[in-house]
Amino acid sequence: LDRIERALKEIQAGSPVTRGTLQTTFQSKAYDELRRLGLTEESERIARSSFPGQTGMLVVDQVIPGSAAADVLAPGDILLRIDGELVSQFVPLASILDGKVGEEIDIELERGGRRIVSQVRVDDLHAITPDEYLEFGDAIVNRLSYQQARHYNRAAEGIYVANPGYLLSKSAIPRGAVIVEMDGEPVRNLDDFEAALDTLSDGERALVRYVTMEDPQSSIVRLLEMDRTWYPARRCALDDSTGFWPCRNLAEGPPPEPPAVGSTRLKKYANPTVNAIAPSLVIVTFDLPYTLSGVSDRHYYGTGLIVDKERGYVLVDRNTVPIAIGDVTVTFAGSLEVKGKIEQLHPLHNFAIVSYDPKSIGTTPVKQATFNTEPLEPGDDVWVVGIKSDHQLLHQKSTVSSVDPLLLPLSRTLRFRDSNIEGISLVNAPNEVDGVLVDKKGRVAATWSSFMLQSGGDAAQLNRGVGSEVVTQFVETVRKGRPFYSLEAEFVYSPLFAARKMGVDEEWIARLEENNPTRRRALSITRLVAGSEASRLLETGDVVLAIDGTVVTSFRELEAAVQKPEVVVTVWRNDQVREIPIKTAALDGRGIDRAVSWAGALLQDPHRAMAAQRGVDPYGVYVAYFSYGSPATRYGLWAGRRVVEVNETPIPDLQAFIDATKDIKHRESVRLKTMAWNGTVEVITLKLDNQYWPAYEVRRTEAGWRRTDFGS
């Protein structure tokens, strides 16, 4: 405890606790080993007589490259004296170094039987121990510490990635990497790194060179894209007098340059079918800055289909663009990449539309896809065409094996899940790529879409085709700005013999058979969306017979029939026919448009998937995510719960939550009434920490997404 006692006395006296280092690791070795290293008999005799109770001396084990001692010391050197004083133990060595910070010392060594006397500067250990960090794009970096430098066996300089966050993970720069260059300029410390970031505007790119501990001798180059939209850029330093880490904002950077216009040529293919569809296919990448709506993975890519050349509309599945907040890029022919934006998410099905600026691709000869809306049947020949992750086109002839209801398990994280749709299965289908199914003329007969599914603790994806009639209706609805009308119920197909067992009379059985003589089925309600009018008027188990007097026996027939504000639903319930007028729900495709971070928890209004899958009332605010180490973690404000009261004040929505919490001070306690998805109530108390976990809101505006702080 010698050095601890010394540090305590210095602190009690109000003096700085100096720490010196040679950036060298020493080991204590026995005389037997020392003799093999070249310790002379005279030096051993002097050491044994001076310290008769000791059995060895100190030997250099490692010297940090680039340090002041690197040109003087070498592994295997035996330490004899410092400034004429014989040193053979760690405590006297530390005592000398702590008292000589910034000074030159005389050091005497033996190396292979030769005596070496030299001078070396004692470095300040505090100067190479991080006491500040830089935060940008949700990433946290600090100067490479002396302790990490020992592991890397490199100089204690460069920028260590403590947390890659959103921005660096987007650039595939991992945790533990050491950044050594930005755009060809060396980066030795945080000042260098901050200066490099200050020159970057929002969205501007820079080349980053880094090394990893796994392969420190080989550097890797990645492209970093600066973010000034989703997260602040700031630098925080330890204040020894208070123990806090106050922060200052970095420079805002220059204004963004107008996007450059580029053009590329498209590859020609020998197969005329592939050649017809290839100009309509692109790669879409999506990066998610926040964990919201049950979606936690941050980076996605998939094949997009150009459905409107004039508007720049591109159709993708919702396993490529799962929610409405994030960064989108569109890549043409593996050569030209442009920025995109999210236009609409289909509120019911596995589709989204993103857009690019048609002017940004110059004369690139893209084409708008044409569609064949005739339903595919088992035995039909199709060509599967999509783009792989390496931007190479894959095309394969296949045959439709079946068209079946797509029944996906309920999402474990309450993310979007498709329902009331039929999926097309193929013979020997390619599962490593998504894209389209085209006929021999190159017309799109169906998409070949990727569906995310969660079963138990595992997540997987499933590829199925979806008929182009669903796509064309979606595109037309988005073009005209119309809402999507939904009955807000989930259905399954019931064979007519099952409908008979439910008591459906012969007249209706005959009408159902006449409507669909091939498949002979009826629609039965299996789940209702909580909070909807249908949840009050319909019941699970109802057999739906007709909409507005027209018999419906398929998902598509029913969905088309309810595209109006109000319908009359004819159902069979309890051995009788009932005609029930119901107002349909008008859904838009905007998706989420605001979220709040509070006490380290990410909050949002309850999204539709909660009501549709688990029957959760759309009341309160939903905890989408919590950050480790935050008050939300310490006090048990877990993800998946809803906050319905704050200090006994009802919280119907996100705005009510903001109003109820904005005046709560730092370190004040607050009572929260929370509910789990199954209705379990728990009241917790939480103490705010506005120093390290300030509250902010992310909101979509006409000018794009904006982040603003709120609270005390």
Model-based region annotation:
Residues 2-8, 395-403, 456-475:
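Conserved, short, structured surface segments that act as functional micro-motifs
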